[in-house]
Amino acid sequence: MLEILLFLCVIIQRSHINAEITHVVSHLAETALRQDTNFQLLSQDIIAKKFPILDSSCVRRALSDFLPQCLQYGFETVPSDVRTQAAVKLSICELQASGVDNMPPECVGAVHFGACLRAMERTPQWWTTYSGNYQHLPSTCFENALPYEKEQLLSLFLNITDVYSNFQDDLVVDLEKYRANFEATVEASLRLMKASLMEGTHEIVNQLKDDLNYVNSKLADMGETITEHTDNVRTVFNDISDELNDYDMAGQIAHLKEDTMSLWQKINSDMGTYHDVQMSSLYNINAVFDTFYNRATESVQQVRTSVIESQLETLDLIADFNSLVRKSILPVLADELQPQLQEMSVSISRSLVGLSASYNEHLQAWSNRVNETLSEMESHLNNTMSQVEHMNDSIETLENKVFVLVSLGNALTTYVKWIYTFSRALISGYGIVTLIMSMLVVRYSIKLNSSWIKVLGRSTFILVAVVLGARTGSMLSY
């Protein structure tokens, strides 16, 4: 019963540990979800505040086709149709900005540049506006060079920002997948460990129950056997006392010897069987606990390996991204964009470092708890081994006592033989020679301690006195 209570305590402790680990996993999931930050909205706010140049304007749209060719290849390489379209668009922008109401219908809405140009030819004012814009196209090209370059640099920055934002979104998705995979792996490992523990514990408890029932049955059988043996010895002694007067003791002595030998053989056989059963039970218990410990160690190692690999992959992705950012951003934008990018990078690094530290801390705590529980189970197993060894010592002590009892039976058998021989010698009249021979036989055939020799001597003296008294009485009466 003591061993069963100990294993029930171990099972309760395991259930408590499983509940704590489930709580830790849920806490890690909440922590990972809190790390999700909408960097796309943050980048849009920063761009809207820092770069108002992105606001759309009529002049910028009018020069969208003309400026790239003029700045890259020179004004002379720009085709005439592109120049004409740029001049017409600038004229329309100028008229719209002046608030002119009677603009040519061909230049309103969806503009057809050929029709709009022919409509401007009909009015000197409009044609003057167009001609002035066409003549100032070379200076317009150089005047808008710096804003255009800034716009191109800003466009490059926005592209980099979009790439960074997409990378952040992908990183968040990967972290969420990693969290889900980690949680699923932990739950699967916990289910496997719980199933293995329950199976091993159930087998151990059943085996211990069977062993205890077997021991109890054997002890009960031994008690009944000893009781029967005691009753048999008592019956034999009564039969010996009844048969002394009839001088018929040889058959009873032989029967007693046969019963004693058969009982001794049966006890030896039962003791050997019980010893073999106990040893096999101990070996089975050791095998079950070794298997459980190996499986638990493999599961913990697999979880730890998967966590380390995921962290290394995350660090590699961050390192690759940092290298890409350093090599792609132009030196012109370093002074303007470095504070914002550095702040965002530090925020992400802190979030990832905090998440990694939290994972490592909780995983280490879980591993320590598993190791402590395994140590407690090992100590319980050692206590069980010591109790089984104590039972084995008790069985050996009982075996020695049974051996002493059998030796006493053999001594009593030899003593009865000697009494019988002595009585027959006295009756038949062989006299002192027979008495001396009988004493020599007893001296060299019985090997007991001094207390038993004293008891046998006194019994012999009383028996001789009784016989001599009976003979003397017969002679006096004669």
Swiss-Prot record:
The subcellular location is:
Endoplasmic reticulum membrane; Nucleus membrane
From which domain of life does this come?
Answer: Eukaryota
Q: Which InterPro entries match?
A: Nuclear_fusion_Kar5
Topological domain ranges for the Lumenal compartment: 20-419, 478
What is the residue range of the signal peptide feature?
1-19
Keyword set includes Glycoprotein: yes
UniProt keyword list:
Endoplasmic reticulum, Glycoprotein, Karyogamy, Membrane, Nucleus, Signal, Transmembrane, Transmembrane helix
Q: Which GO terms describe its cellular component?
A: endoplasmic reticulum membrane; nuclear membrane
What does the UniProt function comment say about this protein?
A: Required for nuclear membrane fusion during karyogamy.
Family assignment from sequence similarity? Belongs to the KAR5 family.
Protein name, please? Nuclear fusion protein KAR5
